[in-house]
């Protein structure tokens, strides 16, 4: 019985060796060298054709795309609003006596102004006039200067280095999100409301106006030095002591081709945020 098992094992081993290489026929793994060469050539041609077809279709598709402007923009037709300084859950909380936390807010404002309002390669433009006709066919579009001093006490210039956070009257910057090709009609401006009756709101520039000279926006690649217009809102509670919690909603008004109310998108033309001021 044991001898039969040994013979069966030797036969199986011999069959495997012959399958790997058969010296009588010269076959390797059941195929001759010419058969292996033909099948490898077939797969080389087949996958080479597939790769070439894929490359060709990608090249044809890329010819239909503009390097500066997205082809499909219908899903983002109206801009939203956003505030600065940015915070988790759009809740800005600070203490007038906490210098370390206040420093982080001041650092944000300083960094923000430095990187968004440098006058390098910017030019003076005519107020309330969109620059469109002179921009056609130009590779790098003109960018208008934003006068930081128009933000009044929220500009952080001499005498207002703390942006109102040291005395409990903080400044919040509101901006409209960028959309390529957007041209607001009318006189767009931002207005904020709150259910709290004990606060005063001041807008800079006056009436929260957004100047048309900053539009249209042509995209990051073409409008390299574009500066976004800002509206600063200075919030002053009537009670200067204790803790104040204020919920505000800022909306975009004055432009008939822009929306500020959509149940499916709470940021479309508006933004809600909470402000907590502590002693």
UniProtKB/Swiss-Prot annotation:
Keywords: Cell membrane, Disulfide bond, Glycoprotein, Ion transport, Membrane, Potassium, Potassium transport, Signal-anchor, Sodium, Sodium transport, Sodium/potassium transport, Transmembrane, Transmembrane helix, Transport. GO terms for biological process: intracellular potassium ion homeostasis; intracellular sodium ion homeostasis; potassium ion import across plasma membrane; sodium ion export across plasma membrane. It is a single-pass type II membrane protein. Its main location: membrane. Abundantly in brain, eye and testis, at a lower extent in spleen. It comes from the Eukaryota. It is found in: Cell membrane. It holds the Pfam family Na_K-ATPase. Residues 1-35 are cytoplasmic. The keyword Transmembrane applies. GO terms for molecular function: ATPase activator activity. The keyword Iron-sulfur does not apply. InterPro entries: Na/K_ATPase_sub_beta (IPR000402), Na/K_ATPase_sub_beta_sf (IPR038702). Disulfide bonds join 125-144, 154-171, 192-250. Glycans are attached at residues 147, 191, 198, 239. The chain crosses the membrane at residues 36-56. GO terms for cellular component: sodium:potassium-exchanging ATPase complex. Residues 57-279 are extracellular. PANTHER family: SODIUM/POTASSIUM-DEPENDENT ATPASE BETA SUBUNIT, SODIUM_POTASSIUM-TRANSPORTING ATPASE SUBUNIT BETA-3. This is the non-catalytic component of the active enzyme, which catalyzes the hydrolysis of ATP coupled with the exchange of Na(+) and K(+) ions across the plasma membrane. The exact function of this glycoprotein is not known. Some specific sequence of the beta subunit can modulate the activation of the Na,K-pump by extracellular potassium ions. Belongs to the X(+)/potassium ATPases subunit beta family. The sodium/potassium-transporting ATPase is composed of a catalytic alpha subunit, an auxiliary non-catalytic beta subunit and an additional regulatory subunit. This is Sodium/potassium-transporting ATPase subunit beta-3. The lineage of its organism: Eukaryota, Metazoa, Chordata, Craniata, Vertebrata.
């Amino acid at each position: 019985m044991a001898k039969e098992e040994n013979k069966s094992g030797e036969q199986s081993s011999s069959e495997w060796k012959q399958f790997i290489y058969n010296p009588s026929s010269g076959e390797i793994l059941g195929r001759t060298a010419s058969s292996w060469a033909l099948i490898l050539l077939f797969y080389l041609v087949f996958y080479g054709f597939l790769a070439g077809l894929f490359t060709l279709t990608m090249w044809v598709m890329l010819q239909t795309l503009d390097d500066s402007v997205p082809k499909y923009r219908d899903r983002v037709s109206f801009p939203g609003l956003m505030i600065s300084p940015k915070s988790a859950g759009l809740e800005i909380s600070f203490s007038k006596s906490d210098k370390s936390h206040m420093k982080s807010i001041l650092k944000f404002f300083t960094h923000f102004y430095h990187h968004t309002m440098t006058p390098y390669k910017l030019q003076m433009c005519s107020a309330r006039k969109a620059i469109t006709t002179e921009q056609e066919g130009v590779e790098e579009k003109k960018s208008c200067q934003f006068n930081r001093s128009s933000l009044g006490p929220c500009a952080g210039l001499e005498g207002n280095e703390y942006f109102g956070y040291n005395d409990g009257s903080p400044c919040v910057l509101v901006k409209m999100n960028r959309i390529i090709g957007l041209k607001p009609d009318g006189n767009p401006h931002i207005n904020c409301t709150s259910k709290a009756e004990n606060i005063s709101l001041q807008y800079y520039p006056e009436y929260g106006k957004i100047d048309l000279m900053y539009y249209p926006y042509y995209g990051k690649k073409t409008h390299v030095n574009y500066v976004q217009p800002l509206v600063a809102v200075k919030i002053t509670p009537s009670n200067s002591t204790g803790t104040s919690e204020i919920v505000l909603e800022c909306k975009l008004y004055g432009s008939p081709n822009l929306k500020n109310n959509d149940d499916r998108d709470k940021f479309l033309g508006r933004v809600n945020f909470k402000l907590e001021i502590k002693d």
